[in-house]
């Protein structure tokens, strides 16, 4: 096993349901300083794990393990932390409860404090749903987080993104093999439909117009869809992915016991020096939404990733985009 497990025990989630044996999977890079002031928190993305986050970690990069203690934490629902696929009945499969980003970040704060004795975070950063968690960290623990960056993500899910995710969800649950979530095998047709739907959202019009699939080794658009997207989620559990979609849809920075629905107060509470990095062509998290968020934050800057790679501008696919993000993180850590 290439990761560790934080045994959180009985955890009552924001929805009111208790997980009797909650587990949080995490991976660390580097060493914790004796002063415990070199901690970077890097939460996971949708349908991803800590193993997908090495693109921003390495010698000479902002997240240099020789300087920082980098903690990559897997969300509940990721398949490694407590998830529908690994939780015992009666909370397994489709009966797994709704998890919010408030739940995830409260568990992550416990992990740092109880396992490592850490109370101050030098930087929290993340891509996509990882960025949602970065916002939650900075808002819920404003006196503990010194710097924050969200790339191709938001603190609150927009209605348009919510609707897109509904379409993705329907692609899975309308497969006859779904069987209301009590499937005997994965609903492969539904997962294929999910991949095809994602293909039109993850990358931009400009990307497709430029036939960028040819740079990925595909002779035609159909070859690309079949070769890259049709089976992209076959290695993931469907209930896990639906749990993460529910978490994504429920993401609202103000909807928690700290701010009681006052979203503007939740953004205004962020003290951390912040750089928000939307992708110019990201359909999930448009620049305009991040502009509205930054306007509510007292110490935030907006830097747009000028890329045709859509949502993937934040995910390490293109060296230039990754270098742009890395420079922002270096500026925050300077």
For each of these PLM feature ranges, what is it?
Residues 19, 47-132, 139, 143-165, ...:
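Gly/Pro-rich cap/lid or specificity-loop segments adjacent to the active site
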Residues 19-31:
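A short loop-to-beta-strand scaffold at the N-terminal edge of the catalytic core in hydrolase folds
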Residues 36-46:
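Short beta-strand element of the alpha/beta-hydrolase
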Residues 248-252, 280-285:
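Acidic catalytic loop of the alpha/beta-hydrolase fold
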């Amino acid at each position: 096993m290439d990761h560790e497990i934080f045994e959180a025990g009985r955890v009552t989630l924001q929805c009111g349901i208790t997980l009797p044996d909650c587990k949080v999977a995490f991976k660390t890079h580097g060493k914790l300083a004796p002063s415990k002031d070199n901690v970077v928190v890097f939460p996971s993305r949708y349908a991803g794990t800590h193993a997908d986050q090495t693109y921003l970690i390495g010698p000479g990069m902002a997240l240099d393990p020789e300087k920082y203690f980098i903690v990559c934490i897997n969300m509940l629902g990721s398949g490694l932390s407590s998830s529908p696929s690994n939780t015992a009945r009666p909370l397994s499969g489709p009966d797994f409860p709704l998890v919010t980003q408030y739940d995830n970040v409260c568990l992550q704060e416990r992990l740092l404090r109880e396992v490592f004795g850490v109370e101050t975070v030098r930087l929290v950063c993340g891509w996509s749903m990882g960025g949602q968690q970065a916002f939650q960290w900075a808002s819920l623990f404003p006196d503990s987080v010194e710097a924050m960056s969200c790339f191709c993500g938001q603190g609150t899910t927009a209605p348009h993104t919510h609707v897109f995710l509904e379409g993705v969800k329907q692609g899975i649950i309308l497969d006859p093999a779904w069987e209301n979530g009590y499937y005997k095998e994965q609903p492969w047709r539904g997962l294929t439909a999910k991949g095809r739907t994602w293909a039109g959202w993850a990358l931009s019009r400009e990307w497709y117009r430029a036939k960028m699939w040819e740079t990925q080794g595909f002779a035609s658009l159909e070859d690309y869809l079949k070769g890259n997207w049709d089976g992209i989620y076959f290695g993931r559990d469907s209930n896990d992915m639906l749990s993460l979609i529910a978490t994504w849809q429920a993401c609202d920075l103000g909807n928690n016991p700290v701010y009681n629905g006052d979203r503007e107060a939740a953004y205004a509470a962020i003290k951390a020096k912040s750089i928000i990095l939307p992708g110019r062509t990201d359909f999930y998290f448009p620049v305009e939404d991040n502009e509205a968020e930054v306007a509510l934050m007292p110490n935030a800057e907006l830097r747009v990733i000028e890329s045709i790679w859509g949502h993937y501008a934040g995910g390490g696919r293109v060296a230039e985009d990754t270098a742009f993000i890395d420079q922002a993180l270096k500026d925050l850590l300077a």
